């Protein structure tokens, strides 16, 4: 069995490290993006829910209630 030349091994190692770095970085960034989108969606949903509740409260306060009829 023949051995590879030292420069072939070095080139192969550098190539593997480059590919692993690119794949790992891509997965890391994709995970961070997914997390950020999820958290922003939750925050937006809470904000909209609170805003609707405030609008309903304001409508109830502004609408005059009819006096009870006997």
From Swiss-Prot:
Which biological process terms from the Gene Ontology are attached to this UniProt entry?
Answer: mitochondrial cytochrome c oxidase assembly; negative regulation of mitochondrial translation; protein stabilization
Region of interest: Disordered: 49-70
Instruction: Report whether Magnesium shows up as a keyword of the record.
Output: no
- In terms of superkingdom, the source organism counts as Eukaryota
The UniProt transmembrane annotation reads 17-38
Instruction: Give the InterPro entries listed for this entry.
Output: COX14 (IPR029208)
UniProt keyword annotations, A-Z: Membrane, Mitochondrion, Transmembrane, Transmembrane helix
Task: State the annotated membrane topology for this chain.
Answer: Single-pass membrane protein
**Chief localisation class:** mitochondrion
Q: Where is the signal peptide?
A: none
CC terms in the record's Gene Ontology section: mitochondrial envelope; mitochondrial inner membrane; mitochondrial matrix; mitochondrion
Its annotated compartments are:
Mitochondrion membrane
Residue ranges annotated as coiled coil are none
Q: What else is known?
A: Present with 6840 molecules/cell in log phase SD medium.
Functional summary from the UniProt entry: Required for the synthesis of yeast cytochrome oxidase.
Name under which the protein is recorded: Cytochrome c oxidase assembly protein COX14
Give the species: Saccharomyces cerevisiae (strain ATCC 204508 / S288c)
**Quick one: which gene encodes this?**
COX14
